[in-house]
Swiss-Prot record:
It is found in: Nucleus. Belongs to the rad1 family. Residues 297-306 have a biased composition (Polar residues). It comes from the Eukaryota. Coiled coil: none annotated. It comes from Schizosaccharomyces pombe (strain 972 / ATCC 24843) (Fission yeast). The keyword DNA repair applies. Recombinational reparation of DNA damages induced by UV and gamma radiation. The keyword DNA repair applies. This is DNA damage checkpoint control protein rad1. Signal peptide: none annotated. It holds the Pfam family Rad1. Keywords: DNA damage, DNA repair, Nucleus. The gene is rad1.
Length: 323
C-alpha cells in the first residue's frame, strides 16, 4: 500500500509534462519516491523522478526497502486534473494564482492525496481545497508486460559534461532550425572542446563550447568521440531543458546518450528528468537484425534496445551530488 500527501502541485506537473509524449507510462513506487518512465521507437527512454521530499507525508508499506510497486497507466488525464490548480489563468485571474507557489497552496488549504493499494487497483490523485472543493483523478492501471529496466548507462562513461540547461536549449533550437535529421556530438580531450553539429539540406551548422568554467561547469572526456543521434528524439528533451536549471550530459562506451536535467522549484526542491537516447549506429544494427530474423522469431523478440545491456545502471535522483 502507498499513501502520500503533497502541496507541490506546480512542480510535479511541470516535471511530468516534460515526459508527456507517449500514451503509456510505467510508474515505479519505492520507499525513495516515484519514478515515471516512457519510451519511443525502441531508441528513447525518458524518466521523471519525484523524490519523497516533495511530499509532506509519504507512507510506503513493504516487507523491505527493496520492495517496489510497478504498473502502467496514462498520465495525460492526471496532468489535465492538476492543471485546474496549477495553471492560474484557467482557474482564476488574480496575479497570485499566476504563480501558485507552495506557500500559496498552504494558505488556500490546497493539498493533494496520492494513493495506490496494490496490483489491479487504480492510481488515485485527489486534490482538496479548504473551501470544500475537491477533484479526484483515478487512473486505471495495468501490469507491465515486461520488467522495465530503469538503469540506462553502461558502467564505463567516455564523456560527462555539466552546464546550464538553457544554454544547451538555445543551441539545440538554433540547430533545429537547420532542418537536419541528425544531431552530431563531438568531444575531444586534446582540444578540450564540446561541439554540436547539424547537417541540413542546404547548410551545416556547428556550435562549439570551449572548456571554460564560465561556460562548462564540468567537462570530462577520455578521448576523441563522435556520435550521431536522431534529432526527432532529441526534441523531446527541449521542454525540460527550457525550464531546467542544469543539465548533465553523459555518453557511455556504446555511445548511449543521457540528458539528465535538474528542475528547481520555487521552494528550492529539485526534481530530475532523464532522457536516454541510443546512437544511430546501434539503431541501424538493431533494425538489420530484425530484418534478418524469421517473422515467427521477430514477434517473440520485440525488446527495447535500452534494456539489452546487462551493465546498465544509474539512478536519476543520485546525480544531484554531481551537479
Amino acid at each position: 500500500m502507498f499513501q502520500a500527501e503533497t502541496v507541490c502541485l506546480k512542480q510535479i506537473q511541470s516535471t511530468l509534462r516534460c515526459i508527456d509524449f507517449s500514451k503509456e507510462c510505467t510508474i515505479e513506487i519505492t520507499s525513495r519516491g516515484l519514478r515515471f518512465a516512457v519510451e519511443e521507437s525502441q531508441s528513447l527512454q525518458a524518466h521523471a523522478f519525484l523524490d519523497k521530499s516533495l511530499f509532506q507525508t509519504f507512507n510506503f508499506q513493504g516487507d523491505s526497502d527493496g520492495d517496489t510497486y510497478m504498473f502502467q497507466t496514462m498520465i495525460s488525464p492526471l496532468l489535465q486534473s492538476l492543471s485546474i490548480y496549477t495553471d492560474g489563468k484557467e482557474r482564476i485571474s488574480t496575479s497570485a494564482w499566476d504563480q501558485p507557489t507552495v506557500n500559496i497552496m498552504h494558505k488556500r488549504g490546497v493539498i493533494c492525496k496520492v494513493q495506490y493499494n496494490g496490483p489491479g487497483c487504480p492510481f488515485i490523485w485527489e486534490v482538496e481545497e479548504m473551501a470544500g472543493y475537491a477533484t479526484a483523478c483515478e487512473l486505471l492501471t495495468m501490469e507491465c508486460e515486461d520488467d522495465v529496466d530503469i538503469n540506462r548507462l553502461a558502467s564505463t562513461l567516455c564523456t560527462k559534461i555539466i552546464m546550464k540547461s538553457n544554454w544547451l536549449y538555445d543551441a539545440l533550437v538554433e540547430l533545429d532550425n537547420n532542418m537536419g535529421e541528425n544531431l552530431i556530438i563531438h568531444t575531444s580531450s586534446q582540444k578540450s572542446t564540446f561541439l554540436l553539429r547539424c547537417v541540413g539540406a542546404l547548410s551545416t551548422t556547428e556550435i562549439e563550447y570551449p572548456n571554460e568554467k564560465s561556460v562548462l561547469e564540468s567537462f570530462e572526456t577520455d578521448s576523441e568521440n563522435t556520435y550521431s543521434y536522431r534529432f526527432s528524439l532529441i526534441r523531446h528533451a527541449l521542454k525540460a531543458l527550457q525550464v531546467g536549471s542544469k543539465v548533465n550530459l553523459r555518453i557511455d562506451e556504446n555511445g548511449t546518450l543521457s540528458i539528465q536535467i535538474m528542475l528547481v522549484g520555487q521552494e528550492g526542491l529539485c526534481t530530475f528528468v532523464d532522457f536516454c537516447i541510443v546512437p544511430l549506429d546501434l539503431v541501424s544494427e538493431d533494425e538489420e537484425e530484425d530484418e534478418e530474423e524469421e517473422p515467427a522469431e521477430s514477434n517473440q523478440s520485440d525488446n527495447n534496445v535500452l534494456r539489452n545491456d546487462p551493465n546498465y545502471r544509474g539512478d536519476a535522483e543520485t546525480e544531484d551530488e554531481d551537479s
